[in-house]
């Protein structure tokens, strides 16, 4: 119980702030019962936050992108995230496990009781 009380506020990040960290954030939001729509919106917010880096990359590779426009999407994946990734992850979880709660229990030991405890701790 004391350990749980100490873990109320948490911060996690990485230098890039996307990909694995983005999926980790998605899983936390899933555990809290957040809607798919909100999870997907949060995931693609990375592109807004990392827009300056993305524009620098596009500028540095402008000639290549002009010659091969598909490269713009490639660089999007380096500096940002592809919007279709979040729904793909959520759909894959449901396809493989039936429900997201079944996935969270099988892979992370988050039983229904633990999920309820997390939701009580972190949601108003």
Question: What name fits each language-model region?
Answer:
Residues 2-7:
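Short, small-residue-biased leader/transition segments that mark boundaries at the very start
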Residues 8-32:
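Catalytic cysteine-centered active loop of the rhodanese-like fold, especially the PTP/DSP P-loop
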Residues 24-124:
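PTP/DSP superfamily signal
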């Amino acid at each position: 119980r004391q350990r749980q009380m100490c873990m109320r506020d948490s911060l996690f990040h990485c230098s890039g702030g996307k990909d694995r960290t983005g999926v980790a954030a998605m899983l936390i939001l899933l555990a809290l019962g957040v809607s798919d729509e909100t999870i997907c919106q949060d995931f693609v917010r990375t592109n807004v936050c990392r827009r300056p880096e993305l524009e620098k990359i596009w500028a540095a590779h402008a000639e290549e992108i002009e010659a091969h426009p598909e490269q713009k999407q490639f660089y999007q994946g380096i500096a940002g995230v592809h919007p279709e990734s979040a729904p793909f992850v959520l759909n894959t979880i449901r396809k493989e496990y039936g429900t997201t709660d079944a996935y969270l229990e099988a892979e992370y030991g988050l039983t229904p009781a633990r999920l309820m405890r997390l939701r009580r701790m972190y949601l108003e």
